[in-house]
Amino acid sequence: MALKSYKPTTPGQRGLVLIDRSELWKGRPVKSLTEGLTKSGGRNNTGRITSRRRGGGAKRLYRIVDFKRNKFDVAATVERIEYDPNRTAFIALIKYEDGEQAYILAPQRLAVGDKVVASAKADIKPGNAMPFSGMPIGTIVHNIEMKPGKGGQIARAAGTYAQFVGRDGGYAQIRLSSGELRMVRQECMATVGAVSNPDNSNQNYGKAGRMRHKGIRPSVRGVAMNPIDHPHGGGEGRTSGGRTPVTPWGKDTKGTRTRNKNKASQKLIIRSRHAKKKGR
């Protein structure tokens, strides 16, 4: 999909760059593959804000996407490519030979009428899913499982992908787009290709109202607040904050590592995504 640039006929149109979605399905989603979605407004079960700057936005239906791809050796045909408001990637409606329908993440270069299959060893074509044990080294993949049978968790956002770079014992080595090199079990499933909509990051929404439609509220700088609200707040006139940048709770906010070093999966990371910054 290409990008659409608009002429500055109004202030909201100036600089506006959106994704051209003219080739996507224009109807409603399959009713049996959707369910209701209640907005939380960034609040948890106690009603307190745990994720700031969220609220409002257009109503959405949740599309049930098959991340597991565990219907083996049954070919499916791509019926249509659809927009999904709940993710940055597009989704594809597929129909299996036995009549069952499902939504999957649409990879790049997947077209209406294409055949896809999940198998222990399938052709290297966009949309086909298989475990790493049946995949040639060098394959570009997305929707990668971290635990066999759990469903894909890695490389699901628009334009993302990972590369299968090697095998070691019972593990497959994959290089993520962040630069991280990590291992997953060879029994884990992955789908061939890179995720659709790679131009998503090049959009410019042009006005605050469009972000409100998406459910994103304004971000207020700490230095614009009062001292009761933020460590950078207060002062006479405009100030610089007077200390290293911190969160509203006083923790360093720029570049501080927050990952728990005692995570069980830590030993599966061969090369950190931060390694290139260290010059390694």
Curated annotation (Swiss-Prot):
Residues 256-266 have a biased composition (Basic residues). SMART domains: Ribosomal_L2, Ribosomal_L2_C. The keyword Nuclease does not apply. Signal peptide: none annotated. Residues 33-55, 224-266 are annotated as: Disordered. Keywords: Ribonucleoprotein, Ribosomal protein, RNA-binding, rRNA-binding. It comes from the Bacteria. GO terms for biological process: cytoplasmic translation. Pfam families: Ribosomal_L2, Ribosomal_L2_C. One of its GO terms (molecular function) is rRNA binding. InterPro entries: NA-bd_OB-fold, Rib_uL2_dom2, Ribosomal_uL2, Ribosomal_uL2_bac/org-type, Ribosomal_uL2_C, Ribosomal_uL2_CS, Ribosomal_uL2_dom3, Ribosomal_uL2_RNA-bd_dom. One of its GO terms (cellular component) is large ribosomal subunit. Belongs to the universal ribosomal protein uL2 family. HAMAP family: Ribosomal_uL2_B (MF_01320_B). PANTHER family: LARGE RIBOSOMAL SUBUNIT PROTEIN UL2M, RIBOSOMAL PROTEIN L2. Part of the 50S ribosomal subunit. Forms a bridge to the 30S subunit in the 70S ribosome. One of the primary rRNA binding proteins. Required for association of the 30S and 50S subunits to form the 70S ribosome, for tRNA binding and peptide bond formation. It has been suggested to have peptidyltransferase activity; this is somewhat controversial. Makes several contacts with the 16S rRNA in the 70S ribosome. This is Large ribosomal subunit protein uL2. It comes from Ruegeria pomeroyi (strain ATCC 700808 / DSM 15171 / DSS-3). The lineage of its organism: Bacteria, Pseudomonadati, Pseudomonadota, Alphaproteobacteria, Rhodobacterales. The gene is rplB.
